[in-house]
Amino acid sequence: MKNCLIKPTLVLVCLALLALPLFAQRGKGGSGGGGGGGSTGCALVSPPTVSSSTAIAGGESVGIFSKVTNCSSGKARYTVTISAVSSCGEETILASSVISFSAGQSFLISKAYSVPANTCKGMGAVYVSAYSGSTMLATGSVALNVQ
C-alpha cells in the first residue's frame, strides 16, 4: 500500500519541479528587452542633427545628436545604435548601447564622429536607431555631405 502512494507522489513532485522554469518564463516579456516575449515595445527617435555646416571634409570631426523616447506604458530595454553610411554604401557602426527606460522616459544621445580621411566623397547619411532584440522599432537619419 505504501508503494501505491509513494510512487505517484514522487511523479507529481518531479513534474512540478520540471514545470517551475516554464511558469517563471511567463512572468518575463513585457515591452522591450531582448529575447522572447510577445510584445516588442514602442520607441521614438527624433531626427538626428549634426554640428557641421552643410559639408565636411574627410579627416574632420562632427557631433551627432538625437533623442530616443520609450513610448510604451512600461519599463523597457532598447539597443540604441548610431551608424554612418558613406556615399559608397559602406556602413560604420559608431556606437551601440543597451539603455533601460522607464515608461515615457527620453534620453539625449550624442556621439563625436571623426570622418575618416579616405571616406568616399559625396552625400552620405548618419542614422540613429532603436531596437528591441533584433526588431527595429524606430530610426532617424540626417544627410552628411563629405567633400
Model-found features: residue ranges?
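Bacterial N-terminal signal peptides that target proteins for export
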Residues: 1-11
